[in-house]
Amino acid sequence: MTLVYQSTRDAKNTVTASQAILQGLATDGGLFTPVSYPKVDLDFDTLKDASYQEVAKLVLSAFLDDFTAEELDYCITNAYDSKFDTPAIAPLVKLDGQYNLELFHGSTIAFKDMALSILPYFMTTAAKKHGLENKIVILTATSGDTGKAAMAGFADVPGTEIIVFYPKDGVSKVQELQMTTQTGENTHVIAIDGNFDDAQTNVKHMFNDVALREKLAANKLQFSSANSMNIGRLVPQIVYYVYAYAQLVKTGEIKAGDKVNFTVPTGNFGNILAAFYAKQIGLPVGKLICASNDNNVLTDFFKTRVYDKKREFKVTTSPSMDILVSSNLERLIFHLLGNDAVKTAELMNALNTQGQYELTDFDAEILDLFAAEYATEAETAAEIKRVYESDAYIEDPHTAVASAVYKKYQAATGDAAKTVIASTASPYKFPVVAVEAVTGKSGLTDFEALAQLHEISGVALPPAVDGLETAPVRHKTTVAAADMQAAVESYLGL
């Protein structure tokens, strides 16, 4: 039986995996979400020797079950190839008291590559499957990493245009240059005077604007998303949690069946939600530890059951987590409410109109799977330094948030279970923060810091940043948040 994906806000709005990938976001504003979980044979005696691509085939064929085996082989083979700088794709590194799952070996040195390398292949395959003649317009808001990874994936892919919005003052210099120097005739990058939540909210509004959808259709265009709101972004992220567990079995760190914790730096809630789905298909997970920075709306939610976005937005050194409206939490809320779309829609409406909601009647077993804590800016910098002094290993600030939060969790609970930290970006993406934390040197430019980081770490400068300083800037547009739709219509000639 084909797996059903349902909107979190309307039980009657159901689609297959390929349809969900093409649509991106449900027309009612909800997110397409599995209402049941596929059966997956997680035999770690076999999986411990499997390649990343083989684990991907096992997981993806279960969740994307209206794709044929040949179609998935095509997608996987083209996605996980020499774009990654290691055959392991996502190597697991043992440090003192923790394991870092390095998700930054792709072409843009951030974890978004893990899913955005394969999403274009999913999308073009799904379009062919459904005889779609419209051009797909990928409309995406980014807090720094998704935008570049999405453009790298979709650049010059026939039948697509991609438009990326990012907060002008909410990304690192390296992140901004990675985006604004992006090549590809079909790529468009626009800075906004506002924060990520402004960008994401306006993108959602455009998806839900019936008049705009009709105008697009009349011009043989349709929107889809490269954000983790798209199930085609989320499902590939399940793969690396299964792969990490298999590596722990292979190296004798655990026995098959032992429970493992995962600590995940969290902004939009997609990465940790993928770990939750891994648990649902049988991965032996102990705790999922949700790590936030000073924008600690999720920490408060898990501790109080109240989600309240009415708070100061803080710009931090871990910008990909500078988010107050965590979109993918809606999927977890849906599951916590027993897949009740009516109740989920009510809570999301309350968030939209009143700025908060309270979870009162929920599945306690699901919620108990999560722990949550946050790390301040000072704690994040101190953790980068501690890990360097302990292991001669440099974490990026997002990974350091997770690492610091894990230490707090351990101190509070005494939980001795083996724990994997999702290491979501290379320190080369945030060189100023990394170098300042390790050496105390301040006032460096990004490019001075890149050279220093290379000297300190001994790790080669990745192609993603090598030559960035002299690359021509192709995208120079900045608009007010309120003018985002006008910019989209202008680019598309509507």
What is the role of each PLM region?
Residues 1-494:
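PLP-dependent amino-acid enzyme catalytic core
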